[in-house]
Amino acid sequence: MDKKQAIELARRYKTAVSERLAIKALYLYGSFSKDTYTADSDIDIAVIVDNLSEDYFADTPLLWRIRRKISNLIEPVILTEDINNPLYSDVVKTGILI
């Protein structure tokens, strides 16, 4: 898979997630955004929300269920805009906003 295909899968994933969850943004991050991907790379996706709901433990499995409809290579995480979170900071700096 190349970067263009990963971006297209991320777009499809964003559309599917948006139908079930109020999201603020979605980023493709990791090896595809840093151009270090290989044939075995997964597709790291950060789903940004305003607030983690009380149903965090329901929202996370939802993201994984939706991924099965798009691609099993997708590895989603759910985050808030917390500049003190190193993962969020890395996603915003190096990720591709979808």
Predicted segments — roles?
Residues 1-25, 33-39, 50-98:
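Catalytic core of pol beta-like nucleotidyltransferases
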